[in-house]
Design a protein with these regions (language model features):
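Active-site-adjacent bridging/hinge elements
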Residues: 15-18, 94-98, 254-262
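Bacterial Sec-dependent N-terminal signal peptides
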Residues: 1-28
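N-terminal, post-signal peptide beta-strand-biased segments of exported outer-membrane/organellar beta-barrel
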Residues: 21-142, 146, 205
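Hydrophobic/aromatic pocket-lining and membrane-interface residues
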Residues: 3, 125, 136, 183, ...
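Short intrinsically disordered, low-complexity coil segments enriched in acidic
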Residues: 1-4, 11, 44, 223-224, ...
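Intrinsic low-complexity, intrinsically disordered segments enriched in polar/basic residues
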Residues: 1-6, 40, 164, 168
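Outer-membrane beta-barrel porins/channels
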Residues: 28-31, 152-364
Length: 364
């Protein structure tokens, strides 16, 4: 039951992230073919413009994109029991009245991915000079991604007495400011080339991973759920706040060897604000005019690096939770072997598995 709840929690978080991103998604890649679009240089630095421009601060260009190999309709479905008392029109793919085949057909057999980008142009200008067209742009960019293995959805939908090799679950996010300087020019009558140099000023980065997740439920004597959880945040002034808590069973020993007590991350703190990382990138592009009707263009984007500092890392103290039932357990009070004692033991195990321990700065 605990394992089912944990799985459903992860799926719910994934679904909410997907819904939030899908609501704001506006894919503007079609602007690649619109010559009047002033920001085409963001898609290919070789593209120029027929006129000079200055953007309205902040409101000049707002772009949000979202893409993935599964969508809202794969998670939220029509309820086959709709019309019955208490049943709503829509439900999730985990509804027991939806067949496993129908519930899982929208998910990739390998990794299922969702990625998104939000780009807010703060200031931008384009002008003709120095034998070509030039652009200057200051923008705030945020990108995020999520990878969910097929086995996670399978486990959530159809938990049974078998072993599940779920694999790796990961979520990541990056936020940074970008100062970009671009120049494009005609090389020949038919060939135009351009380049853009970008300076990247990191605001923050976060990575959450659950590696090597397994749920071994085939055994008759015990069930085991395992996985290594890691949370790493790179942000100026960011720290994890830890506290000491007591186990329910005073004799329980923590993974660090402390009896009756354990340290765990309880909160986070950001002391001040500053540069969390620095990087540089280069865009290269070209456009070739075959004739008045046909043009061929190509671009290579974001060739560069980003180096983050203050990489604060936390991991789960223990990578395994073992449930071996309630054998030889009494309901009444007494020393050892009672139902309450067993529940306390499982609760303490779960605390070791689910809570994070501060590991400090992991380095660049």
């Amino acid at each position: 039951m605990i394992m089912k709840i944990l799985s459903n929690k992860y799926i719910l978080s994934a679904s909410l992230l997907m819904l939030g991103g899908a609501a704001m998604a506006q894919n503007l890649n079609s602007a690649y073919f619109t010559e009047a679009y002033h920001y085409r240089h963001n898609l290919n630095p070789a593209f120029g413009d027929s006129c000079n421009f200055v953007s309205i601060p902040v409101l000049g260009n707002v772009n949000a994109t979202m893409r993935g190999n599964f969508g809202y309709q794969d998670v939220v479905m029509k309820n086959p029991m709709y019309g019955q008392p208490g049943q709503k029109r829509m439900t999730t793919f985990m509804n027991p009245y939806i067949s496993t085949g129908d519930a899982l057909k929208g998910f990739n057999k390998g990794d299922n991915k969702i990625v998104g980008d939000v780009n807010l142009t703060i200031l931008a200008a384009g002008f003709k000079a120095w034998g070509g067209y030039n652009t200057i742009e200051l923008s705030e960019k945020t990108n995020f991604g999520m990878v969910l293995p097929y086995e996670l959805f399978e486990f959530a939908k159809n938990t049974g007495n078998r072993n599940y090799n779920i694999g790796d679950v990961s979520l990541r996010a990056r936020s940074y400011a970008e100062l970009a300087l671009g120049h494009s020019r005609q090389i020949t009558e038919k060939l135009r080339m351009g380049a853009k140099l970008k300076f990247l000023l990191g605001v923050g980065a976060a990575d959450v991973e659950l590696k090597d997740m397994r749920a071994d439920l085939a055994g008759t004597d015990q069930w085991v759920i395992s996985g290594q959880g890691t949370a790493q945040v790179s942000m100026k002034g960011f720290t994890y706040k830890s506290k000491e808590s007591e186990y329910k069973d005073p004799s329980h020993v923590s993974p660090e060897g402390t009896q009756g007590k354990y340290q765990h991350v309880d909160d986070v703190d950001v002391d001040g604000f500053g540069l969390g990382g620095f990087g540089m990138a280069l865009d290269l592009g070209a456009e070739y005019k075959i004739n008045d009707d046909w043009r061929v263009s190509a671009a290579v984007m974001d060739l560069g690096f980003m180096n983050w500092s203050n990489n604060m890392k936390a991991v789960n103290a223990k990578n395994q939770f073992v449930f071996n039932g309630f054998h030889d357990t009494t309901v009444g009070s007494g020393s050892g072997g009672t139902l309450d004692d067993k529940m306390d033991s499982y609760g303490d195990q779960l605390s070791d598995f689910a809570n994070l321990k501060d590991m400090g700065d992991a380095g660049s």
